[in-house]
């Protein structure tokens, strides 16, 4: 069997590329793949090239490696396209999203999925994703795009809307990652869990979540989670080595809703109107909500990356540990025909009955030589669907804004955001949007400045 060509757009995300390729090179069918790295930042691209070459030597991978600053050249003849970039980066754009919102009285935690921060990020990002789709249509029309770029739902929706012929799936690690976290909270082996999960990106819920018993049968762990939370045994501290994020919000939502949500407490806190309010420091303290978490995380990650890069340069080998990312599983399944199941973000074509048709949903997908095949869920519990709809409203209006180049719909999307609407009045929301658009300047599409 011939080897595939795997193109990374945003290869300057070196740690992410290392994790994905560490998985890829453990797959016999992918070990000889041609790896094409593409990034506009020449320094970061060279850093990634050094790390990937050393990674290949460490695991005995023998494929070709090439690196490019021209996107179309990198995409030529690709079988798989992995997309992972952040338009505008931490500086200036993330800093702008947080500073401007704070100036208008709106606090945020992550700001990459919903709210004014997520909306601005979508407006910055979608034109670049469309440009990739243009190039793929020309030079690798049969390739499968594995998209890791946030805001996932809006990005995926916008690409489906304009480029329905592109094979693509939006990928996140929150479904499998949260399952591992909950296993840790209960001192279980994650391999003993099975679950069924569905919803929208960053707001999917485990409709069933079970552990395997000694006799081979399965039983729900929801009673165990609730009891562990009541006893103070869960959540366990220092999740992912970050003492600021204590995961209280999601356990409280489990108590209220009866189901556990996939994305982190710091994310979920800003998707709803309940946790972040002016003058309510008591709520922040009670639910351990870490304001400005993403900027802090960016600063720490940048510092850590410089240390990691130096260690990679000095060492003869790079240790390869399996990641929780789905990318290599998907590539292997499509390339070899060996079936697998992943959770992906796809168009809602009769998959979830009580969410809007055509929106972006996160469901289990069968993957084999026929590609990515989403599975039908049916109807979600009504209260979960209602909660998701509040987020889908924002996604719908933002997608409409960028498809029609209509600035009014940017205002509408921001007005409908649950957190923003709970804090600001209508005129304040319009003023905030105007300030964000002006502050971001040319990072945003030209039609927003007409």
Protein language model regions, located:
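N-terminal Rossmann-like dinucleotide-binding module
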Residues: 6-31, 35
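NAD(P)-binding Rossmann-fold cofactor-contacting core
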Residues: 29-53
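Short acidic low-complexity segments
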Residues: 64-77
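Redox-cofactor binding/interface segments in oxidoreductases and associated redox assembly factors
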Residues: 76, 82-83, 147-148
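Conserved NAD(P)H cofactor-binding loop of Rossmann-fold oxidoreductase domains
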Residues: 85-88
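Rossmann-fold NAD(P)-binding glycine/threonine-rich loop
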Residues: 91-162
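Internal, well-ordered domain-core segments that constitute the primary functional module
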Residues: 132-213
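Long, compositionally biased stretches enriched for glycine and/or charged residues
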Residues: 187-450
């Amino acid at each position: 069997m011939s080897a595939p060509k795997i193109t990374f757009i945003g290869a300057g995300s070196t740690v992410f590329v290392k994790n994905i390729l560490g998985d890829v090179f453990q797959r016999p069918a992918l070990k000889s793949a041609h790896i094409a790295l593409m990034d506009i930042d020449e320094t970061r691209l060279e850093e990634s090239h050094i790390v990937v070459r050393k990674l290949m030597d460490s695991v005995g991978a023998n494929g070709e490696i090439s690196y490019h600053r021209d996107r179309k050249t990198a995409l030529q003849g690709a079988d798989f396209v992995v997309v992972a970039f952040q338009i505008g980066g931490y500086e200036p754009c993330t800093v702008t999203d947080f500073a401007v919102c704070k100036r208008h009285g709106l606090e945020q935690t992550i700001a990459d999925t919903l709210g004014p921060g997520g909306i601005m990020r979508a407006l910055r990002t979608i034109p670049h994703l469309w440009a990739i789709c243009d190039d793929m249509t020309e030079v690798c029309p049969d390739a499968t795009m594995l998209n890791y770029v946030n805001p996932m739902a809006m990005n995926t929706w916008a690409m489906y809307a304009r480029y329905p012929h592109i094979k693509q799936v939006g990928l996140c690690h929150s479904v499998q990652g949260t399952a591992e976290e909950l296993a840790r909270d209960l001192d279980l082996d994650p391999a003993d869990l099975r679950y069924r999960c569905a919803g929208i990106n960053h707001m999917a819920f485990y409709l069933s979540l079970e552990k395997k018993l000694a006799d081979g049968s399965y039983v729900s762990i929801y009673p165990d989670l609730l009891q562990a939370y009541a006893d103070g045994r869960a959540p366990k501290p220092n999740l992912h080595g970050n003492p600021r994020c204590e995961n209280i919000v999601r356990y409280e939502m489990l108590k209220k809703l009866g189901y556990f949500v996939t994305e982190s407490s710091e994310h979920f806190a800003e998707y709803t109107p309940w946790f972040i309010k002016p003058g309510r420091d008591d709520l922040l303290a009670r639910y351990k909500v870490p304001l400005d978490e993403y900027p802090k995380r960016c600063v720490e990650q940048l510092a850590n990356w410089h240390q990691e890069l130096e260690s990679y340069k000095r060492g003869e080998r790079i240790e390869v540990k399996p990641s929780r990312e789905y990318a290599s599983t998907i590539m292997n399944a499509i390339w070899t025909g060996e079936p697998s199941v992943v959770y992906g973000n796809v168009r809602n074509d009769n998959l979830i009955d009580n969410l809007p048709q055509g929106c972006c949903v996160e469901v289990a997908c069968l993957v084999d030589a026929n590609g990515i095949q989403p599975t039908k869920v049916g109807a979600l519990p009504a209260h979960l669907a209602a909660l998701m709809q509040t987020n889908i409203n924002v996604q719908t209006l933002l997608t409409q804004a960028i498809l029609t180049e209509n600035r009014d719909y940017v205002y509408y999307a921001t007005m409908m955001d649950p957190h923003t609407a709970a804090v600001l009045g209508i005129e304040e929301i319009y003023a905030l949007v105007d300030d964000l658009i002006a502050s971001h300047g040319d990072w945003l599409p030209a039609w927003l400045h007409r």
